[in-house]
């Protein structure tokens, strides 16, 4: 049978639950030039892979003319039978729809929305490392940020080359929950 564990009050303190969604969305929006993208009428297809990313993207881009359509955005504990990883092998449907339905961009997020991949208008896969490289170039060249680049040990050597090209320091970190 099942054993139950008695719940006792914590004599050392209490738990405070806080919804940080509004603060998070505001923080992310502060890094986006919304004036530039507000009038753009891009058509974007986002595959959230049955994860948590849909509400954040909608809130971040609220007030723009970007038309967002979501796929795989229902609750599905088995993630629709696919691993919720934004790798090319898992994005066949996104690639097909972006190409056939003439989306300007496809975006894929993993289950907890901390990894990203993209699909170009013709259906070509854009690797996450390329996205990070483009972002680093944009921040340095267009935004004139001069800080270093941080990458995980699992990342490609692309960021090493970009850091060298931009003449900025490269920091490498280990991966895993203990770091």
Positions of the model-derived regions?
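Short acidic, glycine/serine/threonine-rich loops at helix termini
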Residues: 55-59, 80-83, 116-122, 159-165
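Short acidic/polar active-site loop segments enriched in Thr and Asp
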Residues: 104
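Short, surface-exposed polybasic-aromatic patches that bind anionic ligands, especially phosphate groups
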Residues: 107
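Proline/glycine-rich low-complexity loops and linkers
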Residues: 1-26, 120-179
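Gly/Ser/Thr-enriched, mixed-charge loops and adjacent short helices
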Residues: 1-101
């Amino acid at each position: 049978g099942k054993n139950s564990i008695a719940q006792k009050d914590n004599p050392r303190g209490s738990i405070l639950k806080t919804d940080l969604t509004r603060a998070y969305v505001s923080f992310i929006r502060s890094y986006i030039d919304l004036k530039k993208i507000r009038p753009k009428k891009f058509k974007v297809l986002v595959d959230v892979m049955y994860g948590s990313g849909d509400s954040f993207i909608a809130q971040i881009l609220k007030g723009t003319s970007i038309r967002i359509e979501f796929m795989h955005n229902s609750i599905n504990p088995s993630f629709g039978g696919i691993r919720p990883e934004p790798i090319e092998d898992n994005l066949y449907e996104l690639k097909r729809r972006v190409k056939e339905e003439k989306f300007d961009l496809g975006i894929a997020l993993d289950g907890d929305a901390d990894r990203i991949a993209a699909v170009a208008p013709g259906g070509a896969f854009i690797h996450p490392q390329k996205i990070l490289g483009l972002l680093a170039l944009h921040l340095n060249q267009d935004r004139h940020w001069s800080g270093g680049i941080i990458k995980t040990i699992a990342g490609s050597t692309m960021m090493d080359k970009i850091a060298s090209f931009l003449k900025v320091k490269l920091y490498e970190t280990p991966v895993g929950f203990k770091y």
